[in-house]
Amino acid sequence: MATSSTVLFLLLAVFAASASAATFTITNNCGYTVWPAAIPVGGGQQLDQGQTWTLNVPAGTNSGRIWGRTGCSFNGGSGSCQTGDCAGALSCTLSGQPATLAEFSIGGEHDYYDISVIDVYNLAMDFSCSTGDALQCRDSSCPDAYHQPDDPKTHSCNTNSNYQITFCP
């Protein structure tokens, strides 16, 4: 007969397996440097043309956002960007100036994701889920994106999916 600690361990193992992190692979295909930002995890960094940034986002992350900043100049972690700036910081902790947004919530029965240009369009972006639809936003009229808060543009993926964001696809 199993002990209570064995049963507890097995339950925790099952729960942990069902609520694992999602991997976000962010690629810059633009002919110029992009400084992606990510909240609430990730912060931000410089991505030269052809470079990739991989983020592990824990289950239970709600209202996550990733966006591309352009025309940036940083020195020692502070500076400014022409688009998508977040208070002059290289590593963002809050959203900043309006930009094309990849939005997501991870965990629960399903993951949810979308592209938003409600505030502004600043950069072409594809956002895809390993078990769902590939969203494309190539210009300000992109049909896959939210343009108004009540647009029905949220998509769902199976929990434990991984994601790909490509700037200038």
UniProtKB/Swiss-Prot annotation:
Family of this protein: Belongs to the thaumatin family.
Family matches, as Gene3D superfamilies: Thaumatin
Protein name: Thaumatin-like pathogenesis-related protein 4
An individual GO BP term: defense response to fungus
Function: Associated with resistance against stem rust fungi.
Entry keyword set: Antimicrobial, Fungicide, Pathogenesis-related protein, Plant defense, Signal
Signal peptide feature range: 1-21
Upper lineage: Eukaryota, Viridiplantae, Streptophyta, Embryophyta, Tracheophyta
Keyword Acyltransferase among record annotations: no
Membrane-spanning residues: none
Record-linked Pfam families: Thaumatin
InterPro entries: Osmotin/thaumatin-like_sf (IPR037176), Thaumatin (IPR001938), Thaumatin_CS (IPR017949)
